[in-house]
Amino acid sequence: MATDALSIARDLVRCPSVTPADAGALGVLEKLLGDAGFEVHRVTFSEPGAADIDNLYARIGATGPHIAFAGHTDVVPPGDESAWTHGAFSGEVKDGFLYGRGTVDMKGGIACSAAATLEYLEAHGGRPGKDGNGSISFLITGDEEDIAVNGTVKLMQWAAARGEKFDHCVLGEPSNVAELGDCIKIGRRGSQSGTLYVEGVQGHVAYPHRASNPIPDIAALITALVSEPLDQGSAQFQPSNLAFTSVDVGNPANNVIPGQARAKFNVRFNDHHNQESLRALIEARVAKVSGNRIRTRIVWEPSNADVFVTRPGPFTDLVVAAIEEVTGRRPELNTGGGTSDARFIKDYCPVIEFGLVGQTMHQIDERAPVADLEKLTRIYHGVLDRYFA
C-alpha cells in the first residue's frame, strides 16, 4: 500500500463517502495506520433519528507529550456529476491537480497528516518522541458534513472515558484562503439560531380595526435587531453578526390579515458572549421594542457551537515555524469562517486548524494542487519534528 500523500488522498477520494456512508474510507486509514504499528479502533455511534456512523481512533505510543491529528472522511454530495470535468470520485490527477469530492475538504489534509506521520516514524525507529517517549493519534469521523451528532463529539467522549489524554491537536480543515500557508485557524465564533414569533389577530383586510397585523411589528423588530451592533469585536474576533434568514406568515390569501409572523435568524458570536448572555441580550432588545404592545416570543434552537480561541503560545509558534520553513509565508492567526469539529476538541486540549486552500471546497471540480499536498506533508512533518524535539 503506497504511503505518500497523493496516493493516500486518491484512495480516499475514490471512496464515495457522502454522509452518512463510509464507502471504505475509514478502512483505507485503518489498514494504513495498523500496518505502521498503530493501535486502531473502529467505533460506531448511534442517536435516535440519525444514521449510525463509523469513527476511527488510532494511537501509537503510550506516554506524553501526545499530539493528535483530527479530521473527517465524509463529504458533501457531488451535485450534478455530469458537470464535473473529471469524475467526482475518480481521484484523477490532471495538469498538476488532484480532482474529486473531498480532495480539499478534507481527505487531502488527512492524507498529508498520515503520510507525514509515517515518514516521521520511519525516520525515528517506528516510535514517536525522544527515546520513544510520546504519542501520536488520529481522530477521524464520518459525521461532520451533516448534523454531526455521531462523530467527533462522541469520539472525544469515548476517548476520554477510556483514559486518553491529549496535549494538542491539529485539525486538517482547509484553513487557507488563497495560498498554502496564509492562515491558521486558532478559534471559531459561536453559532446560535432562533425563531422570532410575533402574535397578531387574524382578520379581513377590509376591517383592519378588527384585526392586529403582525407584519409591521415584526418588520420593526427586525430593523431594530439588525441596526444596532451586538459588539465591536475583540482582539481575536470580528464583530458578532446577526442575520435573518427567512420571514414568513404562512398566509396564501391576499384578503386576510395573518394572525402570526415569524422570522428565523442566526448569530455568529465572538468571545464577548456565551449562549446564555447572547440570548439574554437579544431578548432584552426585543422586549425594549415590543413594550406591552407587541406579543413576542423567541424559540431558541439547541446549539453545540460555543465560541472558543486557542491562545497563541509555544504550540502555535511551532506550527507557524513549520509553515514558514516550507512556504516562506508567515500565516495569519485567524478566527473567521463557520463552525468546525474543533468546537468539540477544544474541551479536551488546545486545537488549531491548518490544511489545504479552501477555494474549491464543496464546488464542482473540487481540486487541490499536487504540489500543495507535498508541501502540506512537509509542514506536518515539520510540526512533528518540532513537537518532539
Curated annotation (Swiss-Prot):
* Top-level division of the source organism's lineage: Bacteria
Signal sequence, renumbered to the chain:
none
Q: Name one matching Pfam family.
A: Peptidase_M20
Among its keywords, does the record have Amino-acid biosynthesis?
A: yes
UniProt-annotated binding residues for Zn(2+) 1: H72, D105, E173
SUPFAM superfamilies hit by this protein: Bacterial exopeptidase dimerisation domain (SSF55031), Zn-dependent exopeptidases (SSF53187)
The keyword Phosphoprotein is assigned to this record = no
Which InterPro entries does the record cross-reference, listed alphabetically? ArgE/DapE_CS (IPR001261), Bact_exopeptidase_dim_dom (IPR036264), DapE_proteobac (IPR005941), Peptidase_M20 (IPR002933), Peptidase_M20_dimer (IPR011650), Peptidase_M20A (IPR050072)
Task: Tell me which family the UniProt entry assigns to this protein.
Answer: Belongs to the peptidase M20A family. DapE subfamily.
This chain belongs to the protein called: Succinyl-diaminopimelate desuccinylase
Q: What is the lineage of its organism?
A: Bacteria, Pseudomonadati, Pseudomonadota, Alphaproteobacteria, Hyphomicrobiales
